[in-house]
Design a protein with these regions (language model features):
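Extended alpha-solenoid helical-repeat scaffolds
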Residues: 2-83, 87-271
Length: 271
């Protein structure tokens, strides 16, 4: 009888999901620290199980606890295990935990390189998109160097969803690994005239952010931006472009004269 009771308690522990954790914390306001400490011990037991569903459930709970300020860096290897799952539902939980708890100096981050590369090259666009979104939160110099070519390849994807994410991700790559900018520049310029407005906006955003540091390097793109300014109806993008021209006029005063009439037309259009 005692053995059956212990077994029942053990099985019930694995039945606790994120909803149960949140409910339990709310019901134990007077003893919150003690309750969470108990939950942490249960989660550690769950992470030692072979069942990936149990591990994913444990990582989901850890992610919530991390949002409350608890350190979960000790579970980095378990998070990587869930990230590598073949099931998208579990993989998404792993990447969410990684995006919240990993950082560029995280130990064992080097173990994720091949796994992320595999996800970036997945047939399922949402798996590749998930990898791009997660990577943007914890990319390191080594990851940027090793995965730059894979991300550049996605800039030419047939799927606008991936092209847009890849363009935005390249900005993070440039910050960590500036050497990637030169080989990626032709593709980035090409995306400024992408047929998809989302991809085009992403490219404008990336170039404008890069130009804030050194506008002179992007003077060659002035004709492309002038064309966008006179044809686009995206107000957000127009504001970005006008600010960019403002930076460029420091190095090429003629730009101010050339865009004056277009600026007047824009003001009249929205007046």
């Amino acid at each position: 009888m005692a053995l059956k009771k212990v077994k029942g308690n053990f099985e019930r522990m694995f039945d606790k999901n994120l909803t149960d954790l949140v409910r339990g914390i709310r019901n134990n306001k007077d003893n919150e620290s003690k309750y969470i400490a108990q939950c942490m011990e249960e989660i550690k037991v769950e992470l030692r199980q072979d069942n990936i569903a149990v591990k994913a459930n444990a990582v989901a709970k850890l992610t919530y606890l991390q949002m409350l300020g608890y350190d979960i860096s000790w579970a980095i290897f378990n998070i990587i295990e869930v990230m590598s799952s073949n099931k998208f539902t579990y993989k998404r939980i792993g990447y969410l935990a990684a995006s919240q708890s990993f950082h560029a100096d995280s130990e064992l981050l080097m173990l994720t390189t091949n796994m992320i590369r595999k996800d970036l090259n997945a047939q399922n666009q949402y798996e590749a998109g998930l990898a791009l979104s997660g990577l943007s939160c914890f990319i390191s110099h080594d990851l940027a160097r090793d995965l730059a070519n894979d991300i550049m390849t996605l800039m030419s994807s047939t799927k606008p969803y991936l092209r847009m994410k890849a363009v935005l991700m390249m900005y993070k790559v440039f910050l960590r690994y500036p050497e990637a900018l030169r080989p990626a520049f032709p593709k980035l310029k090409e995306k400024l005239e992408d047929p998809d407005p989302g991809v085009q906006s992403a490219a404008v955003n990336v170039v404008c952010e890069l130009a804030r540091k050194n506008p002179k390097n992007y003077l060659s793109l002035a004709p492309v931006f002038f064309k966008l300014m006179t044809t686009s109806t995206n107000n957000w993008m127009l504001i970005k472009i006008i600010k960019l021209f403002g930076l460029m006029t420091q190095y090429e005063p003629d730009i101010g004269r050339k865009i004056t009439q277009s600026l007047i037309d824009l003001i009249c259009r929205y007046n």
